[in-house]
Amino acid sequence: MTKDIIAESVQNDLRYLQLLARSFPTIADASTEIINLEAILNLPKGTEHFLSDLHGEDQAFSHVLRNASGAVKRKVNEIFSNTLRESEKKELCSLIYYPEDKLELIKSQEQDLEDWYQVTLNQLVRVCRNVSSKYTRSKVRKALPKEFSYIIQELLHESSVEPNKSAYVDQIICTIISTGRADDFIIAMCNLIQRLTIDLLHIIGDIYDRGPGAHLIMDILCDYHNFDVQWGNHDILWMGAASGNLVSIANVIRMCLRFGNMATLEDGYGINLLPLATFAMEAYGDDPCALFMPKTKFADNAMDEKTTRLIAQMHKAITIIQFKLEGEIIRRRPEFEMDDRMLLHHIDLKRGVVHIDGKDYTLKDTNWPTLDPKDPYRLSIEEEDLIRKILHSFESSEKMKKHMRCFFRHGGMYQVCNSNLLFHASIPMNPDGTFKSVRILGQDYKGRALLDRVDQLIRTAYFKTGEQEEVEYAHDYIWYLWGGKDSPLFDKSKMATFERAFIEEAETHKEEKGAYYTLREQEEICDKILDEFGVTGMHRHIINGHVPVRSNQGENPIKANGKMLVIDGGFSRPYHLETGIAGYTLVYHSRGFQLVQHEPFESRAKAIEEGLDIKSTTIVVELSSHRQMVKDTDKGADLQSQIKDLEKLLYAYRNGLIKEKERMER
């Protein structure tokens, strides 16, 4: 920047620079900050982890965070390659992953605990020193627990190998042990290692669904140091339920009952399902509900025959209510073009058939005691009373409100970060590769504008701010996003819930995928989408989840010559057989991209007691031509902008446009 340009720019920004001068009141202050920022720009970029489609599998998710997708184990192997046996390295890793539980186990087995403390504390200091090496001291300090901040800083920055400091470092460790603080210190160090190994976490949708622990995943995320989430179709269903959308509420209950996992509903959010159980027993007491038996293979708890039958009755009851409620929205919103999803009025119970697309199909279940053939979409008095009670339960859940606030604060329909475009499922497209126009409240949107508008409507549905017409539309639209043909979170011809439940013929179950899912295999289409979202850089990518990658059938998660990465590898246990693996983590560190392919996680107990880790295979996706530094990232661009502003402030000071002030001593 030339002197003339600086002078003109300073004059234009003088009011802002006067505000900046409050933080940097002297030339020395501004100069020091420039030096600090320039130094940060030349540190290696932090490690980003990308995960998707967790589907309530809290134990596997928690373990992947704790072991940083194998990064902790790799660092332990590098540091102690020839100085520790494999069994000792395994024990150290297990301690880092689960410090509280592992300590209890070790204290019950270890004969010389003081010696173990001495050895282990020194090992943890070495690991922590390694994982903190790419960060500034300031950043590490902010991550430290307050009670041990000073001590950990001393241990990280002083070496026991240095003759002048060896006694000093040794005495710190001895005193930690003698004062009875070793356990707390070990826990603090292990948590710090976990935190520093992952700098930024991206969740590309579907925290919720069939698994038992979505609420536990949300508990972890709400306390996590740095993350973002791109909403998925299952997430939007729960967001709709939290917004008071009755169809979304019926859907989430149906999904939980279908897989026999009520933990998130009942234990996590305190949803009272007793009214549903009472209604189901009365309405379907003599009905075997054979089509609605829960898929108990992956249920959170073993169930006896009586419980299984009750869940089947509840499952059927809420399914029929769901179809009725869907009909109300579809009639109210003809612009959704979902008339083909209104099937109740096509049922002929006397003949036991349903009429679809000019053909009669035999119903597998003809016991519909709450269906009025004259007005099939009308809820019975008992159903209305039931859904009102369930709605109250959802609206009263404080834990759900907390999790949703976190979801909105850290989430969105998409994210652009460090030359990567992240979204869960789709960008609606035409078969010719152009962006598909989607009409919302009388106006057409496509591409990035569509996702921005959808994001806005989701927030309107939950927070209920704005014009009444838009609030009411958003309240219905949040359900449309779950199964509407032009939803960026679905993008299929239909959701065949009714057909799969009641019709044998597989031809009726077919859901045609939108054009995006085939077009994304082409590099030029990916470039078109990246351009639409303003993603720049030599190495730019789209990162999706949503569609499981069947690696056991030879399917490749890396598509379009490396421009497209699909990382739904099947965290959910029911998908393990389908994909052949148990999930992916995409890791983006200073040297490039790696895709980590996980085997199934056995259990937290085995990880603690036997040191059993997830077996992972690392695939190199892309190596950078040079090591990526902070200056190569979005954060680096922000820092460079700050440096330019500080340089203008220096110019203003040195040319008398702003007067220096003495810094007040604190």
Curated annotation (Swiss-Prot):
<dbReference type="Pfam" id="PF06874">
    <property type="entry name" value="FBPase_2"/>
</dbReference>
<comment type="similarity">
    <text>Belongs to the FBPase class 3 family.</text>
</comment>
<dbReference type="GO" id="GO:0042132">
    <property type="term" value="F:fructose 1,6-bisphosphate 1-phosphatase activity"/>
</dbReference>
<keyword id="KW-0378">Hydrolase</keyword>
<protein>
    <recommendedName>
        <fullName>Fructose-1,6-bisphosphatase class 3</fullName>
        <ecNumber>3.1.3.11</ecNumber>
    </recommendedName>
</protein>
<dbReference type="InterPro" id="IPR029052">
    <property type="entry name" value="Metallo-depent_PP-like"/>
</dbReference>
<comment type="pathway">
    <text>Carbohydrate biosynthesis; gluconeogenesis.</text>
</comment>
<keyword id="KW-0119">Carbohydrate metabolism</keyword>
<dbReference type="InterPro" id="IPR009164">
    <property type="entry name" value="FBPtase_class3"/>
</dbReference>
<dbReference type="GO" id="GO:0006094">
    <property type="term" value="P:gluconeogenesis"/>
</dbReference>
<keyword id="KW-0464">Manganese</keyword>
